[in-house]
């Protein structure tokens, strides 16, 4: 026998001997019997990554050398809530045209070509209460990519032909506002919950879009775009010290006044409880059921999150999904969500889409599940399942350095409680069956529910022969209102 053959045989014998005890371990009868050690995970601390540049810009920064990439994501203190009356859409155009409209030294076409050459992805947008801008590039191209990115932010061209194209596209999109029942439902649900004057319901019109010119974009940009008005989340393949030097240099020439940005007006006004019906010739009706809830600083948010997961937020294991979809087969998608607002209260919303004839019956089933979770304690098994799921999936919030930095930047912008992430799992772990029932009783108030039904109202009213339920029977206080569709260009009702 050759020497290498003897060595191989000896190695195999040793391997078999070592493997024998493992093979002797009992095999679990099912995956449920598998045992795992608890995952030891502590979220990163924001203060370990927070830096203030000389110009006042806040930066959350972390090295991540897993790929040769760099990410810079900015949050800018601005928003469409700042649109002047009669020029709704100005903030949105300012955000989109930052990227699409060129820079001081580059036409829009040259900017496109430059970014393609650098293999850099750049974006910008402005939403209701914040603006954003992002750069993702190869670490080898960082210097040139960052230079172009900062010029775009500081000295946008807002090229006239690109703005004209964006204006024309916006007007064309307006024509489609009533084409999709899902779009109608989402739009009108927000108005029913918070009212026409809420910052989230400032609709663009054909008149407001036509009133916006290049000078308006320049003035809006000049007023709100300054380094001290930005928070950056930076991660990637770099030396932290070197990256901070690059950021200091890139933004050094930008004037640093911090504008007094008006605060968001949180005022809201819900419609009266009842059933609100909107006619749309579609084979399936869309239904939203809910009410305004609490802000993010409420001590009840943890119990409400768990309550909603049990009721309709956890997919096939949740009560609404199981009852409406799995047991009755009335909807492909049915569930609920619970949001917690930063400026105004968030909301609870249960929703589904069902055949017209079964809309009322499905709505009755959802309301019955709401009643049950108020009046009957959830089971210990339901509670533990949801608590364990929330605790075990918690680390995924911080799956990458980039995600973590973005969370810290968002928290700084919205002033989230500093201990939220460090205390989250303990607060979830401490919840009891009584806590869940308490918040259900306090916040899911049947007499205050709003029901929005979008679909073929004649078919919906005919109902299901096996389950002859009428929407009028479900209306809180017996109130029923028919809402006509808005004119897509003026957003006025006839």
Describe each model-derived feature in a short phrase.
Residues 31-51, 190-230, 262-267, 394, ...:
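Histidine-acidic residue clusters that define the catalytic metal-binding segment
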Residues 169-188, 266-285, 322-331, 376-427, ...:
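Short acidic/His-enriched helical or mixed secondary-structure segments at domain edges of catalytic enzymes
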């Amino acid at each position: 026998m050759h020497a290498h053959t003897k060595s191989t045989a000896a190695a195999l014998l040793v391997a078999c001997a070592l493997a024998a005890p493992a093979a002797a371990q009992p095999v679990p009868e099912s995956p449920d019997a598998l045992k795992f050690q608890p995952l030891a995970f502590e979220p990163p601390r924001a203060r370990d990554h927070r830096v203030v540049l000389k110009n006042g810009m806040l930066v959350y920064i972390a090295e991540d050398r897993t790929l040769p990439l760099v990410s810079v994501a900015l949050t800018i203190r601005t928003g469409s809530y700042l649109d002047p009356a009669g020029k709704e859409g100005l903030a949105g155009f300012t955000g989109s045209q930052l990227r699409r409209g060129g820079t001081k030294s580059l036409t829009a076409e040259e900017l496109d070509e430059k970014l393609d050459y650098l293999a850099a992805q750049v974006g910008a947008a402005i939403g209701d209460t914040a603006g954003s801008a992002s750069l993702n590039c190869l670490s080898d191209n960082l210097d040139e990519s960052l230079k172009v990115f900062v010029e775009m932010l500081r000295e946008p061209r807002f090229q006239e032909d690109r703005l004209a194209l964006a204006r024309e596209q916006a007007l064309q999109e307006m024509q489609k506002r009533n084409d999709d029942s899902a779009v109608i439902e989402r739009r009108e649900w927000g108005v029913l919950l918070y009212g026409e004057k809420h910052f989230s319901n400032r609709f663009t019109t054909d008149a407001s879009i036509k009133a916006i010119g290049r000078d308006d974009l320049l003035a809006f940009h000049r007023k709100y775009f300054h380094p001290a008005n930005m928070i950056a989340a930076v991660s990637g393949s770099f030396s932290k010290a070197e990256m901070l030097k690059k950021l200091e240099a890139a933004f050094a020439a930008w004037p640093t006044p911090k504008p007094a940005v008006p605060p968001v007006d949180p005022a809201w006004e819900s419609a009266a409880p009842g059933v609100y019906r909107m006619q749309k010739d579609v084979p399936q009706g869309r239904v939203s059921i809910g009410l305004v809830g609490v802000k993010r600083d409420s001590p009840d948010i943890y119990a409400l999150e768990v309550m909603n997961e049990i009721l309709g937020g956890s997919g096939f294991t949740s009560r609404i999904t199981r009852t409406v979809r799995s047991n009755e087969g009335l909807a492909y998608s049915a569930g609920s969500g619970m949001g917690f607002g930063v400026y105004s209260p968030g909301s609870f919303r249960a929703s589904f889409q069902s055949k017209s004839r079964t809309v009322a019956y499905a709505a009755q089933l959802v309301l019955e599940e709401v009643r049950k979770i108020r009046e009957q304690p959830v089971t210990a098994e339901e509670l533990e399942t949801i608590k364990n799921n929330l605790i075990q999936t918690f680390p995924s919030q911080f799956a990458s350095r980039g995600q973590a930095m973005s969370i810290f930047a968002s928290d700084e912008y919205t002033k989230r409680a500093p201990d939220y992430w460090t205390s989250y799992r303990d607060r979830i772990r401490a919840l009891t069956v009584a806590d869940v029932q308490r918040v259900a009783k306090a916040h899911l108030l049947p007499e205050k529910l709003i029901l929005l039904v979008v679909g073929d109202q004649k078919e919906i009213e005919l109902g299901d022969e096996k389950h002859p339920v009428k929407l009028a029977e479900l209306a809180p206080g017996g109130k029923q209102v028919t809402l006509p569709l808005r004119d897509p260009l003026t957003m006025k009702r006839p």
